[in-house]
UniProtKB/Swiss-Prot annotation:
Effect caused by changing S149A: Reduces self-association
Protein name: Reticulophagy regulator 1
Membrane topology classification: Multi-pass membrane protein
CDD domains: RETR1_RHD
UniProt disease link: Neuropathy, hereditary sensory and autonomic, 2B: A form of hereditary sensory and autonomic neuropathy, a genetically and clinically heterogeneous group of disorders characterized by degeneration of dorsal root and autonomic ganglion cells, and by sensory and/or autonomic abnormalities. HSAN2B is an autosomal recessive disorder characterized by impairment of pain, temperature and touch sensation. Onset occurs in the first or second decade, with impaired nociception and progressive mutilating ulceration of the hands and feet with osteomyelitis and acroosteolysis.
Pfam families listed in its UniProt record: RHD_RETREG1-3
UniProt region (Disordered), positions on chain: 1-51, 319-365, 377-396, 436-455, 468-497
Length: 497
């Protein structure tokens, strides 16, 4: 029965090679480039180094745990496991209570006046008292037999053997990092001793200054905080969460500031474009339709009662009044000046009433305005000046147009000419009457004056006598009376002016 087995196995195994022969050959794997191969090799080396470091750390942790157990015993190892649980913050309430207890113990040790050996003795005494109380309670409750059985069968049972070396693992990892740091520092010392000396001196100086300003108690408390808080941040990834939130806020802030700046730039450019377009449209519109501001017009029309204002027409249809001047009106004294100048310039062609009379008086021979007329006019001007000043200071007066000015000037010129003529005639008549009254009745001189002059000025009584002697008619007397009336009317008119 043993002989047919090989053929059966051979028969059963025959189809397999046939299937393998019938199956198509698998394609060869793609060949990687040299750079990729080198990168893969480096990654494999790094992974192997990490695995080796992990194994070394685990081995060192095991050795440290064994050494601590051998030196301090199981109670110390149990305390180490409890401390590991507290520092890992697996149970937040217990970790918080341990943190508060550690702070209280630290500040008690820092502020108490007792020395270190006093504190150690107190701690040992407290431990002994606790153990005695525990024994008494257990002996009374369970009895001596139970206590003996418990003491005889006492064994250390660890339900979680994997968590025991955790604190020792951290200690071992820290020790390995410290040993690596020492090796690197020794290598740095061999390569550059000067830099190493400078670095060590700088570090020592820094810690000296820090210790002079910050007490050692504060530094120790900071170490305690780091021992409790660093595992909390590391286990819960609090630092990574805070960093991600801060990064998102910074990104939003950066984006918001950039968008705000770009928006302000766009608004400013649009405002500049609108302003330039508006300025161009306003210039075109102002060229077609000039605007007259009320404030500018009021300022131009603001005048005072000092001098004559100068009115000038501008290109846009407005007029300008020089500030501090008074425009000419019908009540202004300056309107008489050009009329008097024109009258005195053209009065030289007016025929003389004396007609060659031999008088050398400048007032009588001058054909200008008489002194009496000037005196009366000065009196009238002195009376009218306050009223004119009050009128000019009372409000603003606008200049007259060309037609009104022409009519006003013509009327004033006519009135002035009429008044001047009447005053001249009256003065001449009064002068003739005074000369006749003062002159002596000498016939020879009269005949001489009659021969030398064209006419003779006689007194009124003499005129009446001559008229009666010559036998004038009543019509001539009526004409003489009309002349008297006209002269009286002219004198009254002159007195009114």
């Amino acid at each position: 029965m043993a002989s047919p087995a090989p053929p059966e196995h051979a028969e059963e195994g025959c189809p397999a090679p046939a299937a393998e022969e019938q199956a198509p050959p698998s394609p060869p794997p793609p060949q990687a480039s040299p750079a990729e191969r080198q990168q893969q090799e480096e990654e494999a080396q790094e992974a192997g180094a990490a695995e080796g470091a992990g194994l070394q750390v685990e081995e060192a942790a095991g050795r440290a745990a064994a050494a601590v157990t051998w030196l301090l015993g199981e109670p110390v190892l149990w305390l180490g496991c409890r401390a590991d649980e507290l520092l890992s913050w697996k149970r937040p309430l217990r970790s918080l209570l341990g943190f508060v207890a550690a702070n209280l113990l630290f500040w008690f040790l820092a502020l108490t006046p007792w020395r270190v050996y006093h504190l150690i003795s107190v701690m040992i005494l407290g431990r002994v008292i606790m153990q005695i109380i525990k024994d008494m309670v257990l002996s009374r409750t369970r009895g001596a037999q139970l206590w003996r059985s418990l003491s005889e069968s006492w064994e250390v049972i660890n339900s979680k053997p994997d968590e025991r070396p955790r604190l020792s693992h951290c200690i071992a990892e820290s020790w390995m990092n410290f040993s690596i740091f020492l090796q690197e520092m020794s290598l740095f010392k061999q390569q550059s001793p000067g830099k190493f000396c400078l670095l060590v001196c700088s570090v020592c100086t820094f810690f000296t200054i820090l210790g002079s300003y910050i007490p050692g108690v504060i530094l120790s408390y900071l170490l305690l905080l780091c021992a409790f808080l660093c595992p909390l941040f590391k286990c819960n990834d609090i630092g990574q969460k805070i960093y991600s939130k801060i990064k998102s806020v910074l990104l939003k802030l950066d984006f918001g500031i950039g968008e705000y700046i770009n928006q302000k730039k766009r608004e400013r450019s649009e405002a500049d474009k609108e302003k330039s377009h508006k300025d161009d449209s306003e210039l075109d519109f102002s060229a077609l339709c000039p605007k007259i501001s009320l404030t500018v017009a009021a300022k131009e029309l603001s005048v005072s009662d000092t001098d004559v204002s100068e009115v000038s027409w501008t290109d846009n249809g407005t007029f300008n009044l020089s500030e501090g001047y008074t425009p000419q009106t019908d009540t202004s004294d300056d309107l008489d000046r050009p009329s008097e100048e024109v009258f005195s310039r053209d009065l030289s062609d007016f025929p003389s009433l004396e007609n060659g009379m031999g008088t050398n008086d400048e007032d009588e021979l001058s054909l200008g305005l008489p002194t009496e007329l000037k005196r009366k006019k000065e009196q009238l001007d002195s009376g009218h000046r306050p009223s004119k000043e009050t009128q000019s200071a009372a409000g603003l007066t606008l200049p007259l147009n060309s037609d009104q000015t022409f009519h006003l000037m013509s009327n004033l010129a006519g009135d002035v000419i009429t008044a001047a003529v009447t005053a001249a005639i009256k003065d001449q008549l009064e002068g003739v009457q005074q000369a006749l009254s003062q002159a002596a009745p000498i016939p020879e001189e009269d005949t001489d004056t009659e021969e030398g002059d064209d006419f003779e000025l006689l007194d009124q009584s003499e005129l009446d006598q001559i008229e009666s002697e010559l036998g004038l008619t009543q019509d001539q007397e009526a004409e003489a009376q009309q002349n008297k009336k006209s002269s009286g009317f002219l004198s009254n008119l002159l007195g009114g002016h």
